[in-house]
Amino acid sequence: AFRQQAWTALLAHRPNVIRANASEVMALTGLASQGRGVDATTTTEDAAQAAIKLAQQQCCIVAMTGETDLITNGTHHYRLTGGHALMPRVTTLGCGLSALVAGFLAANQAHPLSATLAALACFSIAGSRAGQQASGPGSFQVALLDALYALTPDDLSSLSQLETLHAV
């Protein structure tokens, strides 16, 4: 109940981007989910239509993250793959990604969809690189920070994990 009240209050401010996992997107649209609280057992594919509906209802971008990310403004839809299997095992990575999205939005206010895509792509690339270095969740967290620090613009230009979806 508290979480739903908090979401309602936040949505009243008309955010430019909603960054959430699939279970959270399902809850925001009032659809049943297989997750409870932060348990993200609903897959991105299961919640794709809910994300599009939420983006259309709120006139914003929805960045639904999970094993596969779906980014939509209600009209244009993108799928991003990458990252690493350790990412869901590290607490606060979703919050960190939300902060990264906010930073990218602040730097590129005129193009919020591009800013959101770039933020998620950076996180995905850094997660993949961190996973190659880490031996577990603790070392992954540190390796992720180092990988984010080491990213260059060229790293984004070679991104092949981003797919434009014509229908979801």
Question: At which residue positions do the language-model features occur?
Answer:
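N-terminal glycine-rich phosphate/adenylate-binding segment common to multiple enzyme folds
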Residues: 1
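Short pre-catalytic strand/loop immediately N-terminal to key active-site residues, enriched for Gly-Thr
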Residues: 48, 80-91
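Glycine-rich phosphate/pyrophosphate-binding loop at beta-loop-alpha junctions
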Residues: 72, 76-82, 117, 122-136, ...
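Charged C-terminal helix
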Residues: 125-168
